[in-house]
């Protein structure tokens, strides 16, 4: 029995429509995965892993770049792989186990080295050359340490509501009786090393109550380990992803269709019935829920439009918190001219201009014979440097090095690497910092879902914002919130924090 012509035409029309929808990425808008994860950095991969473990396997991960890992990303520099972003496992050898440490040190066996800052007093260079007297510097370090200890005691007495919070600088003024805080070149560079080198913002903007003491070190230990493995620190993210995403055994490449790279999310529509996500290539995907793991800097930008707009309380939480900038500048030289040996890995440049190429690291152990130095800048210096040419930055650095080592024949650097996280629209900075005036309740609003839109990222980690382990743990925590709603119908989120 033959089909009627009208039925055949309908079938052809339906087929053409399906092909057209599939070509434009819109077919997914009618069937869609249950959960879309925006971003394949540590928190996004961690969240998707926890969802998968809970039986939510109909996932789609949309990543804006051509790789996973986010701010954990290596690049080749002068023949060696170095880390553009996260580099350390911070918080090791304490009472609790940092969840990243066993993956790095035991499972993957990534090359890592304990960073030893105990000898800084003998490695502080004057602005006009030579080193400061070690005893003098040691006394200034001990003074800074004692002021910080007084700050810890003061922090513990502040009202749980956060109403009495103050900046770290205000605390320093109270204890040092100096109106501007540390003011001499040595005091400023020690201060910069203690705070800016950790938080990427100065003490005048950083919350005392929420950063002193720092939970990362109180919980996990004071030691930090520098990852210097040619596989990259990002190998941790690939390892986690490989536990639930299909991976090619030979190449190690993720081949699971649930991970889509080069998908720049530009719009998220949400309603009581579900979510729709649109990407820059005009693909459209629908789901029951969306987990947004984009950085705080991206949320503060106009890259992703939410429809309807996020409620005022959510927007205020996003804009109240700080997205800091931490820039690691690598330089390659034809030969070494700096001191090496025990206690020489880290050295400081005590400029009269606070934060001007102040913290240096040499890699005798990590990259032997590579002749590479690393200098770190943050905050306004980072933003300034991102907007000038690498040649101009190199010229500034060479001038500093020749001041530090006036008796040496200091050659020009042959290569320079200047990451530009602040300028990158997919990050808009490196990690979050807790500013003064934001209490724990307001902070937890960063993590709180809005309808079917959930949020994760290091900036949503209750105790460990700014750290790799914070991103990892926040992914798990945010996934649990979504699981409670999707599987247990416990969808009402109570904004809370340690103050409750």
UniProtKB/Swiss-Prot annotation:
Disulfide bridge partners, by residue number: 485-491
Signals that turn on the gene: Induced by light (at protein level). Down-regulated by auxin (at protein level).
Protein name stated in the entry: Polyamine oxidase 1
Record EC number: 1.5.3.14, 1.5.3.15
Lineage, highest ranks first: Eukaryota, Viridiplantae, Streptophyta, Embryophyta, Tracheophyta
Segments forming a coiled coil: none
InterPro entries for the chain: Amino_oxidase, FAD/NAD-bd_sf, Flavin_amine_oxidase, Flavin_monoamine_oxidase
Entry-linked SUPFAM superfamilies: FAD-linked reductases, C-terminal domain, FAD/NAD(P)-binding domain
pH dependence remark: Optimum pH is 6.5.
Top enzyme class: oxidoreductase
Species per Swiss-Prot/TrEMBL record: Zea mays (Maize)
Subunit-structure text: Monomer.
């Amino acid at each position: 029995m033959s089909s009627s012509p009208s039925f055949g035409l309908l079938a052809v029309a339906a087929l053409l429509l399906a092909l057209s929808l599939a070509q434009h990425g819109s077919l997914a808008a009618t069937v869609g995965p249950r959960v879309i994860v925006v971003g394949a950095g540590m928190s996004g991969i961690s969240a998707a892993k926890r969802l998968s473990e809970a039986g939510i396997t109909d996932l789609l991960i949309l990543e804006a770049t051509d790789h996973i890992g986010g701010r954990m990303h290596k690049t080749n520099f002068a023949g060696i792989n170095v880390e553009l972003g996260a580099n350390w496992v911070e918080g090791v050898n304490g009472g609790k186990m940092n969840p990243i440490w066993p993956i790095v040190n035991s499972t993957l066996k990534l090359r890592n080295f304990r960073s030893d800052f105990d000898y800084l007093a003998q490695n502080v260079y004057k602005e006009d050359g030579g080193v400061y007297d070690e005893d003098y510097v040691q006394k200034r370090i001990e003074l800074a340490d004692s002021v910080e200890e007084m700050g810890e005691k003061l922090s513990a007495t502040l009202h749980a509501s956060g109403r009495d919070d103050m900046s770290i600088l205000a605390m320093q003024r109270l204890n040092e009786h100096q109106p501007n805080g540390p003011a001499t070149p040595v005091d400023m560079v020690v201060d910069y090393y203690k705070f800016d080198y950790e938080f990427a913002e100065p003490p005048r903007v950083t919350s005392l109550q929420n950063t002193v003491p720092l939970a990362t070190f109180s919980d996990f230990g004071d030691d930090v380990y520098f990852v210097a493995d040619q596989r990259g620190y990002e190998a941790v993210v690939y390892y986690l992803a490989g536990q639930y995403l299909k991976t090619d055994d030979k190449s190690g490449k993720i081949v699971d269709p649930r991970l889509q790279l080069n998908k720049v999310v530009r719009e998220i529509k949400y309603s009581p019935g579900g979510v729709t996500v649109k990407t820059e290539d005009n693909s459209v995907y629908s789901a029951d829920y969306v987990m947004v793991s984009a950085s705080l800097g991206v949320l503060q930008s106009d890259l992703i439009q939410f429809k309807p707009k996020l409620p005022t309380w959510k927007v205020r939480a996003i804009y109240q918190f700080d997205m800091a900038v931490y820039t690691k500048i690598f330089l390659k030289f034809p030969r070494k001219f700096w001191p090496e040996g025990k206690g020489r890995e880290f050295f400081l440049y005590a400029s009269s201009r606070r934060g001007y190429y102040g913290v240096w690291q040499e890699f005798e152990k990590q990259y032997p014979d590579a002749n590479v130095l690393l200098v770190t800048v943050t905050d306004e210096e980072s933003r300034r440097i991102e907007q000038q040419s690498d040649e101009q930055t190199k010229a500034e650095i060479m001038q500093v090095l020749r001041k530090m080592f006036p008796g040496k024949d200091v050659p020009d650097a042959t290569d320079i690497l200047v990451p530009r996280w602040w300028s990158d629209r997919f990050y808009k900075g490196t990690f979050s910092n807790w500013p003064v005036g934001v209490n724990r309740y307001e902070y937890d609003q960063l993590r709180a879902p809005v309808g079917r839109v959930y949020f994760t990222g290091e900036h949503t980690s209750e105790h460990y914002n700014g750290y790799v382990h914070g991103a990892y743990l926040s992914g798990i925590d945010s996934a649990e919130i979504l699981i409670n709603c999707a599987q247990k119908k416990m969808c009402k989120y109570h904004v809370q924090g340690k103050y409750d």
